C-alpha cells in the first residue's frame, strides 16, 4: 500500500436545508407577528442575507426545541419590534430601556453568523440612526416626522410584501444564504 491512502468516500458536506427552512419560517413568522409596517429595505436585505444565516446556525447547532433557538427567535422579534415607528411615549421609553440589551444580543448574533466587519458596522450604524430617528419622533412637529417611505405596510395583498415572503420560502430563499 502506498504512503498516500485513498478512499472512495467523498468529504461530508453538511446539509443545511432543514435548518434554512426552519430559519426562513421563523423569520417569516417574526415579521408577520410584528405590528406596523415592514422594515426598511436595508433591514429586510440584512435579515434575508445575514440574520437568517445566524438563525440557520443556531438551529443547526442547537435544534428546534433548544433554549438557544428560543433566544434567537426572541432577539429576532425584539429587533423587528424595535424599528416599528410609534408615537407612544411609553413605547419610546420602553425602547430606550431595552436598547442596550438588544444591541448586545444583536452583536452576539452577528458574531455567531461571522458577518463581514464592514457589513456589520454598516448595519449597526444604520440601525442606530433608525433608532435615534424613532426616538426623536416625539420631539418633531407632526409635519416633519421621519421619512419612512421605504417601509411597506403590512398588507398581504401588497406585491412587495408577497415578494418578501417569496424570498423567505422555497429555493429563492436559499440563494441568499452562503454556508
Segment roles from a protein language model:
Residues 1-179:
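Extended, low-complexity, amphipathic alpha-helical coiled-coil/linker regions that act as scaffolds
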